[in-house]
Amino acid sequence: QPSKVLVVDTETAKESPTLFARSVTRQVFTDEGELSTIIHAKELLQRDPSEAAKALTPDITLYRDGKASWYITSETALLNPDGTTTLINDVKIQQAKEAEENWLLVTPELSFHAERQYAYTEHPVTMTRIGGRLDAVGMEMDLKKETVEFKANVSAVYQMYNPQDQD
């Protein structure tokens, strides 16, 4: 006989996760067996296997030709049963390139499909890089092809770089 019995009422049981894990990593491979995506989360919680799992502080790295090509982070994410990941709150997408070529994209929510390396949002988006800023509402990204299509209310400001300004 057990020395301790845990008594949980039915209302508490409905709210309690059926799955809880710390420091979780998921690797996604192409049909050819090459690494395409690594998704890491500090914690993973799920109440019902048929529902989305909630990931805390997810960190996604996309790979192309064996090298990191994109980084995506947020405060939380929902790993949906259909294979999409919905990143929520302070979503940041950044290219894994040299600093002078790098840009940062920020949005409050983003849907991401790891196998297709495709992302989209209907929310406001801000893209910044040295000397420039672009604001829009909604976008679609094909991360394999490295293309971005902004949907509406697009405005951009770009400051030309002049090497003589550094004197």
Language-model segments: residues:
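Mature-chain termini and adjacent capping regions
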Residues: 1-167
